[in-house]
């Protein structure tokens, strides 16, 4: 059901809830004046020409580093500067470590055992410890480096069959990431090169789930309507989750029946810790979903920025030639490629894959920068606005990788002007894998191929429009014509 129809058909019911749930707090953060019944929804969803993340960044310039928006009956607090982010992610990290869960993702099979969406329970702490110390530990990642190198080599080889043709870069990068993750999870590929449609495959199902989760949901604004699922979004998401689970159901059963003590992928670790099927399914889904989509979006942005900036592309290739020569890039080469790493950081700064990070929730009422943040408010950190804040960055809209060579700013969570992976106890647990995989793929692509644009378009003509779904994607998707480099 269309969101607008759902809203207007329920105005009488909504009015009752509005009257019962009028804000009781004083000294709230500044923000645009809310309309009766619908709060600030018109500001956010009526201007379709400007993406939401840009609208909110512009609003922060008016209302300040901490502002409040009313989405229907629900307060959402937005932090839009490095100082405000530090208050949320460090000073009050315990209070804001709770999660605001998207309604579409509140699946009965999933939330109880979720690493991404559950609150900081004892189970969550145990799961996070296992992931950090056994699955994404330096030792485990090092042991699997040859697998990632092999999967990237398969991408490079496949692109030779597409030489001279128009290629949507995200399609095959996403598939490569799925295969890397498939081998992390249960030592199997899940994507087949040459299957252009992937109909019913994991790639399409994962992307469909993420798109459904990103759709505006009337129940987000009026939670009392959640059980009605008026738009059918939770049902659609649940159906796809069940279909995805069936894809690895046989693998899990086979592994249980034939345990190999020498094998050490994610499935082995979970079985060794006596995880049940529901726990395994929840972690598998979160590994394949956010892990593949955010890295794919980042890689696409880096390639686009380098195509549009020939001088920077030439510097990356010069560095690769000096370090790698005619050899294949290995993960062990990555620490010796600072300019490549700087280009990736710069693309992350300009186009963070998760521009609001993942939504948090105020576990209790507290005070931030002199303002009252009500209990159960959704709390967002606008990493996009922070990455383009002129108070933190010189020429913030310019792609200038050298800025990261001239400073010690990194993305590990201690520098709040640059937090693409978040910070605090909710820092992305997949960061150690992403920071190996992304430069390996980007470096391999630009080292092996020149990328022309369809129709003979020039680099300066490349459109860099942004589209916000659950991730920040380039719009339209980057299409290139690969040509093998001599």
Swiss-Prot record:
Q: Which cofactor does it need?
A: heme
Task: Give TM segment ranges.
Answer: 6-21
| Topology in membrane | Single-pass membrane protein
Compartments it resides in: Endoplasmic reticulum membrane
GO biological process assignments: alkaloid metabolic process; secondary metabolite biosynthetic process
**Any one GO cellular component localisation term in the record:** endoplasmic reticulum membrane
Which Pfam families does this chain map to? p450
Q: Give the EC number(s) under which this enzyme is classified.
A: 1.14.19.51
Domain of life from the UniProt record:
Eukaryota
Keyword terms, alphabetized: Alkaloid metabolism, Endoplasmic reticulum, Heme, Iron, Membrane, Metal-binding, Monooxygenase, Oxidoreductase, Transmembrane, Transmembrane helix
Note the Gene3D superfamilies from the entry.
Cytochrome P450
Q: Which GO terms describe its molecular function?
A: (S)-corytuberine synthase activity; heme binding; iron ion binding; monooxygenase activity
Q: What does it do? A: Cytochrome P450 that catalyzes an intramolecular C-C phenol coupling of (S)-reticuline in magnoflorine biosynthesis. Catalyzes the formation of (S)-corytuberine from (S)-reticuline, and also, with a lover efficiency, the 4'-O-demethylation of codamine to produce orientaline, and subsequent C-C-phenol coupling of orientaline.
User: Which family, according to the similarity comment?
Assistant: Belongs to the cytochrome P450 family.
Under the heading PANTHER family, the entry gives: CYTOCHROME P450 (PTHR47950:SF49), CYTOCHROME P450, FAMILY 76, SUBFAMILY C, POLYPEPTIDE 5-RELATED (PTHR47950)
Q: What is this protein called?
A: Corytuberine synthase
Q: Which organism is it from?
A: Coptis japonica (Japanese goldthread)
């Amino acid at each position: 059901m269309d969101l607008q129809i759902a809203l207007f058909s329920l105005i009488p019911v909504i009015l009752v809830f509005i009257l019962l749930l009028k804000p009781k707090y004083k000294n709230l953060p500044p923000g645009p004046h809310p309309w009766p019944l619908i709060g600030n929804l018109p500001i956010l969803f009526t201007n379709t020409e400007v993406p939401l993340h840009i609208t909110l960044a512009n609003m922060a310039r008016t209302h300040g580093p901490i502002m409040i928006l009313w989405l229907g009956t629900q307060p959402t607090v937005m932090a839009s500067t490095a100082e405000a982010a530090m208050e949320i992610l460090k000073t009050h990290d315990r209070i804001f470590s709770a999660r605001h869960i998207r309604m579409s993702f509140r699946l009965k099979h999933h939330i109880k055992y979720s690493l991404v969406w559950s609150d900081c329970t004892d189970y969550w702490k145990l799961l996070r410890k296992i992931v950090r110390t056994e699955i994404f530990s330096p030792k485990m990642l090092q042991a699997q480096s040859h697998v990632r190198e092999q999967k990237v080599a398969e991408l490079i080889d496949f692109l030779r069959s597409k030489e001279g043709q128009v290629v949507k870069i995200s399609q095959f990068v996403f598939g490569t990431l799925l295969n890397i993750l498939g081998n992390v999870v249960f030592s199997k590929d899940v994507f087949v090169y040459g299957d252009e449609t992937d109909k019913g495959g994991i790639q399409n199902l994962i992307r469909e789930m993420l798109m459904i989760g990103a759709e505006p949901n009337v129940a987000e604004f009026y939670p009392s309507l959640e059980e009605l699922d008026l738009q059918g979004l939770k049902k659609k998401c649940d159906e796809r989750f069940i279909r995805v689970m069936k894809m690895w159901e046989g693998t899990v059963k086979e592994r249980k029946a034939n345990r190999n003590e020498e094998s050490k992928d994610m499935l082995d670790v979970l079985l060794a810790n006596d995880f049940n099927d529901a726990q395994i399914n929840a972690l598998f889904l979160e590994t394949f979903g956010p892990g593949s989509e955010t890295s794919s979006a980042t890689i696409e942005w880096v390639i686009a920025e380098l195509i549009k900036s020939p001088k920077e592309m030439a510097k990356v290739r010069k560095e690769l030639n000096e370090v790698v020569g005619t050899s294949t890039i290995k993960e062990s080469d990555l620490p010796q490629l600072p300019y490549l790493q700087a280009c990736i950081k710069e693309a992350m700064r300009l186009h963070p894959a998760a521009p609001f990070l993942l939504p948090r929730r105020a576990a209790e009422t507290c005070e931030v920068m002199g303002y009252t943040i009500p209990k159960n408010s959704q709390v967002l950190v606008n990493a996009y606005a922070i990455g383009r804040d002129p108070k933190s960055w010189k020429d913030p809209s310019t792609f200038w990788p050298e800025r990261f060579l001239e400073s010690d700013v990194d993305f590990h969570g201690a520098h709040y002007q640059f937090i693409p992976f978040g910070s605090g106890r909710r820092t992305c647990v997949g960061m150690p894998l992403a920071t190996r995989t992304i430069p390996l793929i980007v470096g391999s692509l630009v080292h092996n191929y020149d990328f022309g644009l369809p129709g003979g378009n020039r680099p300066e003509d490349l459109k860099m429009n942004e589209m916000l779904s659950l991730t920040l994607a380039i719009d339209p998707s980057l299409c290139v014509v690969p040509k093998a480099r001599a």
